[in-house]
Every structure is written in structure tokens, then in C-alpha cells.
């Protein structure tokens, strides 16, 4: 996967936080999960988890899907998005060529 400079910055920025790394790791290990369960597993509050999930989703690292449980409650499930990229000096140089003003 060839990333633009802005995409690479968003992904690296999103992963530059220990909570977000743990969230991605937990979702990778256990598969999709909903916010309350994931907050317990990662050991952070639901509001803080929401902020981190939003950042991860904006970077394209996780996806969400709203579903109804058997008792009619709306649950927002999150899972790791399929992504793979090789971080090499050449890949960074290539991505840097496409940086926009917002990626400075």
C-alpha cells in the first residue's frame, strides 16, 4: 500500500500514543468489540476511549459499525481496519513528496 504523506502522518500520529497502541492490539487479538468491553480491557474510561477511537478511525486504522443487540440496545462495534505498509526511508521520502499544507 502506497500512502500519501498526509495519510502516513495521520497513521503515525494516531499510533504515537500508548493507549491507542493498546487499543489496536486488543482489537487485533480479540477481534471486533464494543466500547464498554474495550474500555474495561484496555483500562481507560469510555469517554477517553471514544477520543482515542475517533483518532484511530480518522487515520483509517479502525472501523466502526452500529448494531442492535438482542435486547434492542445500540452497540457501536469497532475492529481493526485492514492495513499494511512498510516503513522504510524510501517510503518516507516518497510520501513526503505528496504532503499538503495541512500535513506540515
Model-derived segments and spans:
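Glycine-centered, phosphate/nucleic-acid-interacting loop/turn motifs that mediate DNA/RNA or nucleotide
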Residues: 60
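Long, low-complexity, charged/polar intrinsically disordered regions in eukaryotic proteins
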Residues: 1-6
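Short beta-strand "wing" residues that participate in macromolecule-binding interfaces
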Residues: 64
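N-terminal helix-turn-helix DNA-binding core of bacterial DNA-binding proteins
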Residues: 7-45, 67-69, 74-79
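Conserved segment of winged-helix/HTH DNA-binding domains
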Residues: 29, 69-104
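Short, hydrophobic-biased segments on the C-terminal half of alpha helices
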Residues: 53-54
Amino acid at each position: 500500500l502506497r500512502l500519501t504523506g498526509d495519510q502516513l502522518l495521520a497513521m503515525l500520529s494516531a499510533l504515537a500514543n500508548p493507549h491507542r497502541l493498546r487499543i489496536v492490539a486488543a482489537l487485533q487479538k480479540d477481534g471486533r468489540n464494543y466500547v464498554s468491553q474495550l474500555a474495561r480491557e484496555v483500562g481507560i474510561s469510555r469517554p477517553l476511549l471514544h477520543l482515542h477511537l475517533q483518532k484511530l478511525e480518522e487515520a483509517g486504522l479502525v472501523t466502526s459499525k452500529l448494531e442492535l443487540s438482542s435486547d434492542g440496545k445500540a452497540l457501536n462495534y469497532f475492529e481493526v481496519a485492514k492495513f499494511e505498509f512498510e516503513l522504510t526511508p524510501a517510503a518516507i521520502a516518497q510520501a513526503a513528496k505528496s504532503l499538503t499544507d495541512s500535513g506540515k
